[in-house]
């Protein structure tokens, strides 16, 4: 018997810190979000922890290693049955290069967040990060 709830897939993203700045990445696809900015990450696969998924996704998308810090309080709906969880992370090895789904990366200070053309679905997560790091 079904209870009427649909299955939710978690998407994890990393607010990677370095020298007082956070790494943001510009999407290349799908077309409706191309050119918009986000914190990089991806979907948690079945049987995978959020932390392992985030380390894997950042390695695949940017070619670097990170350590995962605190999760920013909140859960933000994306499209369909996807929800976003945002973690603070620290770069520990490598120089980030956009390898998949992104064509540019930038390091921005929190004070510059308002000048970033964020994905609409990320705006509330960005606001929560700003509040958590104030």
Residue ranges, per PLM feature:
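Conserved N-terminal beta-strand and adjoining loop/helix that marks the start
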Residues: 1-23, 43
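Short secondary-structure boundary/capping segments
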Residues: 4-6, 14, 29, 75-79, ...
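Conserved Nudix-box catalytic region and its N-terminal flanking loop in Nudix hydrolases
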Residues: 21-60, 64
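Active-site-adjacent beta-strand/loop module that shapes the phosphate/pyrophosphate-binding cleft
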Residues: 65, 73-97, 106, 129
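NUDIX/MutT-family hydrolases
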Residues: 88, 97-134
